[in-house]
């Protein structure tokens, strides 16, 4: 049996987190405190310190806010200058930043709560500008979708997916979340979506961030939503919901072009349609022969999918391929659920949980900024690596803080010399 020696030195297994903490402080602390305001003048924690503490939970492999107190505090507090707050302080800060929900009534008289969390949404955009992930004056591609979050909180409502929860509308540019507005889980996806999108677009435009192309699913295919989206972007690409008036036109079409997209054979065509009176748009039609050979009562031997757009120049294939890229955004929701705490909401009410959703979205955006700056190949990582891989390959390294010649030095016990460069460059 091997001999064991117990050493009482203050070693930490999370040596990689300290350079990330310093980078967070350098890039975002001023932006966070200027946007949210100072939380205290003398004693206590600023919002930037609270958000940094929450970031450490997920970048050290934690799964809930309480992990910062129960598991991580003794390690994070080893940093000689940067303070880490407790889980209770984070939870109090969430309550302080909570924005009152707005209640809307539908035509049928039913009430639905929305939470816009304007200040936190502004911070989300400002943080992306501070890290350089978005630049003022440039145009970007924009995606919008609703994510159904399963939870049994006090005010959770039954969704059409047969579970209790919320259904926040989430706006994405590239791989970054740029806006979140939470809603009751039983809210129809089109209900007040125009107002939600308009607030998000105006928030981006106030920071001189403009939208070139917008992609959305059939939940956004209504006249008022399309009119508003068209006013804020160059081109839109929206999945058209099927209706009987389209079928007559589609069945009469000739000149279908056979193409192969991602190894699957489709036939493409496009026509001009007047879906709403006096408003003609291009309808790109994609059809695929049914594999089972069964005939559908409406569509016959094919399955039809349509994209409504105001792009009259791009080829049908280019439009279909561009729209299909929207499916990759589902990875973001999977990442948020499993890596950044969306599957473990901390509070009992929607308004407070909306603040948490936005906090963790900011942390994920920052994580993506780190992956862009980091020489990932030196640590066996990729720019698209999940947070779990990042924890194993970068964060989990033994380290010890020592003081020598009146300076604090971090000793990292690793044969990977790449760690030495983190504090020598603008990364650490």
What do the predicted segments below correspond to?
Residues 1-163, 169-186, 193-207, 396-428:
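Dynamic "connector" segments at or just before major functional cores
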Residues 68, 259, 316-350, 355, ...:
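Short amphipathic alpha-helical "interface-anchor" segments enriched in bulky aromatics
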Residues 147-149, 176, 183-185, 243, ...:
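Short, glycine-/Ser/Thr-/acidic-enriched flexible segments
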Residues 189-247:
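Domain-level cores of phosphate- or acyl-group-handling catalytic modules
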């Amino acid at each position: 049996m091997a001999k064991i020696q117990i050493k009482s030195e203050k070693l930490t297994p999370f040596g990689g987190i300290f350079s990330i903490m310093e980078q967070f402080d350098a890039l975002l602390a001023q932006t966070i405190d200027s946007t949210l305001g100072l939380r205290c003048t003398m004693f206590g924690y600023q919002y930037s310190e609270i958000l940094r503490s929450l970031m450490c939970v997920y970048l050290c492999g934690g799964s809930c806010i309480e992990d910062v107190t129960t598991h991580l505090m003794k390690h994070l507090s080893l940093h000689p200058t940067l303070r880490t707050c407790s889980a209770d302080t984070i939870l109090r800060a969430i309550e302080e930043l909570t924005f009152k929900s707005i209640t809307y009534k539908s035509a049928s008289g039913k009430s639905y709560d929305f939470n816009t969390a304007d200040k936190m949404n502004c911070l989300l955009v400002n943080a992306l500008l501070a890290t350089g992930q978005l630049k003022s004056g440039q145009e970007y591609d924009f995606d919008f979708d609703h994510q159904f979050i399963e939870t049994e909180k006090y005010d959770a409502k039954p969704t059409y997916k047969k579970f209790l929860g919320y259904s926040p509308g989430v706006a994405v540019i590239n791989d970054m979340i740029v806006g979140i507005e939470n809603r009751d889980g039983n809210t129809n996806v089109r209900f007040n979506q125009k107002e939600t999108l308009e607030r998000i677009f105006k928030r981006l435009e106030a920071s001189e961030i403009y939208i070139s192309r917008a992609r959305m699913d059939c939940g956004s295919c209504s006249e008022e939503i399309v009119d508003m989206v068209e006013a804020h972007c160059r081109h839109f690409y929206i999945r058209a919901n099927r209706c009987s008036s389209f079928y007559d036109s589609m069945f009469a079409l000739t000149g279908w072009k056979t193409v192969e997209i991602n190894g699957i054979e489709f036939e493409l065509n496009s026509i001009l349609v007047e879906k709403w009176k006096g408003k003609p748009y291009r309808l790109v039609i994609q059809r695929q022969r049914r594999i089972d050979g069964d005939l559908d009562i409406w569509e016959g031997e094919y399955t039809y999918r349509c994209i409504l757009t105001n792009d009259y120049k791009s080829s049908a294939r280019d439009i279909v391929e561009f729209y299909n890229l929207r499916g990759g955004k589902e990875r973001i929701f999977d990442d948020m659920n499993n890596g950044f705490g969306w599957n473990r909401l901390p509070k009992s009410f929607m308004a407070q949980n909306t603040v948490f959703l936005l906090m963790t979205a900011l942390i994920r955006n920052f994580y993506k900024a780190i992956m862009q700056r980091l020489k990932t190949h030196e640590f066996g990582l990729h720019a698209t690596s999940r947070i779990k891989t990042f924890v194993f390959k970068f964060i989990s390294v033994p380290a010890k803080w020592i003081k020598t010649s009146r300076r604090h030095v971090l000793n990292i016990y690793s044969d990977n010399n790449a760690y030495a460069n983190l504090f020598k460059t603008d990364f650490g």
